[in-house]
Design a protein with these regions (language model features):
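Hydrophobic beta-strand segments within beta-rich accessory/binding domains
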Residues: 55-71, 111-114
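Bacterial N-terminal signal peptides
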Residues: 11-21
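Edge beta-strands of jelly-roll/beta-sandwich modules across compartments, strongly enriched
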Residues: 53, 118-130
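Extracellular Ig-like/FN3 beta-sandwich strand-entry sites
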Residues: 62, 107-109, 120
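Non-catalytic extracellular/lumenal accessory regions of secreted precursors
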Residues: 24-54, 60-64, 130
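Bacterial N-terminal signal peptides that target proteins for export
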Residues: 2-12
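Short, surface-exposed beta-strand/strand-loop-strand elements in extracellular ectodomains
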Residues: 73-87
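Short beta-strand segments within Ig-like beta-sandwich modules, predominantly Fibronectin type-III
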Residues: 89-95
Length: 130
């Protein structure tokens, strides 16, 4: 009985550890809302090291999206994933993207993931859809 309890305890600790690690890597998730009559949304936020903020944005195939990010220390970057979960060309994670513009290939929710390149980052994200 003692060995079984130890095995289950070890599995529970490992599962909890993995869950907490996954939660620590995600900052805020927000839906992008455009002010009435506007095509640009300005979003402000802050991310700490090893976390990412996610912005969800509904758009249609053929629309052009432009994304620009600024931060005081130039240490905030983003990646964009299409509705299929695949990164858009030129906006892949790890590419340290600060500016991107392109025609959207599909209709649905796009995810913009903001992360710091070093330390913590306070940022302003501008998203335009036309």
């Amino acid at each position: 009985m003692g060995k079984i309890a130890i095995k289950y305890s070890a599995v529970a600790v490992l599962t909890l550890s993995l869950l907490l690690t996954a939660l620590a890597q995600t900052g805020q998730t927000r839906r992008v809302r455009f002010p009435k009559g506007r095509t640009t949304a300005v979003l402000k936020g802050a991310v700490i090291r090893a976390t990412q903020d996610q912005f969800l944005l509904g758009a249609r195939s053929g629309q052009t999206m432009t994304v620009h990010i600024t931060s005081l220390e130039k240490n905030a970057v983003f990646a964009i994933l299409g509705p299929n979960g695949v990164a858009l060309d030129g906006a892949e994670e790890g590419s340290d993207v600060m500016d991107w513009s392109g025609e959207l290939p599909a209709s649905g929710d796009y995810s913009i993931w903001v992360s710091p390149t070093r330390g913590n980052a306070t940022y302003t994200l501008e998203v335009t859809i036309r």
